[in-house]
Amino acid sequence: ERGVYAATASGTQLLGGSEYDDEQPNIPNGIVRVGLAFGSTALDAVHLQIKTGSGFAFGYYDSDRVFQSVGSTAESAVTVIADTNVTVGDSAFGAYHVQLGDTYASFDAAQAAANSCGGYPVYYNGSYRVRIGSYRSADDAPAGQGTVVSGGARSVLVVKASTEQILFGFDCGSTRSL
């Protein structure tokens, strides 16, 4: 049966839709929450695409199960990848990045700084930073621009689909997951 499905812990669930292309699924509040699994059996990447409209909010659920937004994009298709040395399609990503020294109070401030230097904003342990590049080894990263870092246990990168353009990073070690 055609429709919009979600993979859940209890199996595949139909969210809505029908056999007709012009009939949109009835998704409560127009929101589908997507989480990532971590561990030895986790996938390296997940592709997300919106058929109608655009935009994704990035965040985590706090201890009260309230969504805390830490970033966003207007893109209609993104790939979320584990921040490791990984190849997704024709694109190769590395686990090492150059982190600039400044911290920022908001996603918007970090995004503005990232735009001026060719980097991307990162939510890093409760604050915002800017990182540049994605390198397969620490030696490949140009350390003169900042500090060479690698991501934590649950670090992920959000990439514009089918490109190597990193839009956002999330790195809270093993304390939080995007």
For the regions a language model picked out, list residue spans one by one.
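Conserved, single-site charged/polar hotspot
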Residues: 1-178
